[in-house]
Amino acid sequence: MIDEEYKENVEYIRSTIMPKLQKIQRDLAESLPGVSLTVRLDGETGSMSAYAAVFDDTCKVTDCCTANFFYVDNKEEIDDEYNKLAEFLKKYTA
């Protein structure tokens, strides 16, 4: 169960981070084969994780990155996780 003190972080994850990840997923689906982004949201705790993978022509994963957005983290830690994932994806979308 989510503690009262963490509800603001859960809302930040859902209202700020999640839409950014959904936009990345839409962009990847339209223009970049060989890169995938999977997002998982835990409805009970409000935590979220994202897994990005890069595949070669044989569908072998050649690089990957996982970002975890925990409701117990502060906004700076949540933003750091998002930025880590965004930087990883930038290498393959630039």
Where does each model-flagged region fall?
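Amphipathic beta-strand/beta-sheet edge segments enriched in Tyr/Trp
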Residues: G46-D57
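Negatively charged, low-complexity tracts enriched in Asp/Glu with abundant Ser/Thr
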Residues: M1-S47, V61-A94
